[in-house]
Amino acid sequence: MLIRYKKNLEKIAMGLLSFMPDEKKDVKKLQQTIKEYETNDNWHLHLWKEEDDVRGAIGVRIEDELHVIIQHVSVNPSHRNTGIGRTMVNEVKRLYQNKYAVSTTDEIEDFYHKCAEVEDTTIDADD
């Protein structure tokens, strides 16, 4: 289930974001990123929780009145290749698509398009 980030999950969120290439375990950069999610109303961090375990993080930035950009997608290494990343991307698209055009940073663009391809294949299979 996708939940909004809360301050009491800061260490878990920082750990997940540290797997992003731009963050790469740079503690000061991670702290700045988390602070931005906590203080900037246009930055939204969501966590993926199953049972009592946070397994992933996805962060978006509202660029303007029409665009939201997915800028962070990270899954705990022990839960990778289980569909969590794809599920988070698709959930965020569902959350924001009625109000914004959803896109990504260059860093995660390929992953985003793979998620869309898998979703399209699933929809076609259901027809």
Predicted regions and their residues:
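Short amphipathic alpha-helix that is part of the acyltransferase structural core
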Residues: 1-29, 126
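Structured beta->alpha junctions
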Residues: 5, 74-77
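Short, basic/aromatic recognition patches
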Residues: 29-35
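A short helix-loop-beta-strand connector motif used in the catalytic cores of GNAT acetyltransferases and
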Residues: 35-47
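Conserved beta-strand in the GNAT
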Residues: 47, 53-62, 69, 74
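Conserved acetyl-CoA-binding loop-helix of GNAT-fold acetyltransferases
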Residues: 75, 81-94
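Conserved GNAT acetyl-CoA-binding A-motif
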Residues: 96-110, 117-122
